[in-house]
Amino acid sequence: MRVLSVLLVALTVAGSAYSQCTVNDASSAQLDSTFGPTTGGDALTFNNNLGNQIQIANNYNFVSNGVVQSNGGDNLVLTGTLTPANSSLTDKFSLRAAFVRTTTPSDVKRELQAGAYTSNGGTVDPSTWSFYQILPDNTKMVSLTNPNTVVTMSENPNTALQVGVGANGKNLQNGASGWFQFKATDGSVSIQSGNGEMEVVDININLGCSSTFDCVSNTYTISKASIDKSLTDQQNDQALYVDQVSTVFGNQQRFDTSSGTVNTISIDQTNGNLRLGAGFTSISDSSITVNCDLRFSPALPSANYQPKLELMNSAYVSGGGSIDPNTWAYYTVNVSGSSCTRNDGTVVTITGDQDNMYLQWGKGANGKNGNFGLSVWLNYVDAALTNPFFDINVDTVCETNPSTNLPETSPPTEQPTAPPATCPPGCIPAIPVVNVTETPAAGNSASSIEMSKLVVAILSLFILAFFH
């Protein structure tokens, strides 16, 4: 069975005739029969059989999809649900590992056969790789069945997570790998890795465009997330819900997406920012409408962050279901660039994420069904109420022919194209970086793919000119 995680990487596209995908699947880095080493093939490995000392497996792969979210490459956050590989043990783990971009370490790992590298006539050039330092305070593995079983990770001296073609150390594909010291405990017994290279936790993954998050247009149509009775006991569904009766929302609490308006979310490839533009109509009084233009930046949740889980426990991987919250992407609101406006001109002033809960996006993230969607909880200003907020629950579908016409709103004081200089708690500063090299298909080199895309672009321009 092909095991996957997802790498969400918003890439800067500079001087290129094409746009790379903003999301990548990450699968276990399988051994290349010609250029690979003699051992490996799993996504995460405790070397020297250290895992068995506290009754956990030594080798793990992802159950379904995880997410590494980035604002353009400065920070990466790898999340996923791990299951033992080739072991009688069944204990699954929730993984969150955070990284920050760093300089080239003194110990760049070259695990492939010598002939794989450009210095010996091969195709793998380590000078093109990017490197990331682990953030221990935001990195943790926790057992889904025994929360007392916890693994923390820290930097292994002179090394870093390396990302690029051949960087996974197992094959010639685009990927990532890293070696980290760790401390593991099951609540009563603790083990800690030594400084030796044989006593580390090892991550080895392939990277490739995601069939789930990758939308060529970077634009998604949104609609009300209808309740799936097999997954939730909730009774009411709506696209927008106001928690208290508020004059700001015309004393209406339940809204559906408006017909006749463009209701979309769009992704900025240069920094990973998300923009939600939609119209909402009161379900009980169709004369009252609200148009919203909301801006978000990728968030960096802590290792202990708990997403909002509104479905039955049995719907989630931890309860035996198929929905994995570790596959979701998270965003924090940019209040200076966000606003909602009622059709009578009343402006809804957004003040932040309600109770520090981030916008969550992915399969089942809307809290109403198992579809690909999102939910978000936002505080707003109403002097007559205490801690007022509204939440949005919608399905999202890739738009093949997106429109750029968003619902009209009162323009905010500032229209930023990137997060503010001082981000809200959890916000990642937007720092565009050089593109990660795209994975070549089997039998093709990265350079041949680039040449093919350039040829296609030139032919397209020729055809347009000829028929003009």
UniProtKB/Swiss-Prot annotation:
- State what protein this is by name: Uncharacterized protein DDB_G0291392
In which compartments does the protein localize?
Cell membrane
Report the main location listed first in the record.
membrane
Stretches the record annotates as Disordered: 401-421
Enumerate the UniProt keywords alphabetically.
Cell membrane, Glycoprotein, GPI-anchor, Lipoprotein, Membrane, Signal
Query: What's in the GO CC field?
Result: plasma membrane; side of membrane
* Signal peptide positions on this chain: 1-19
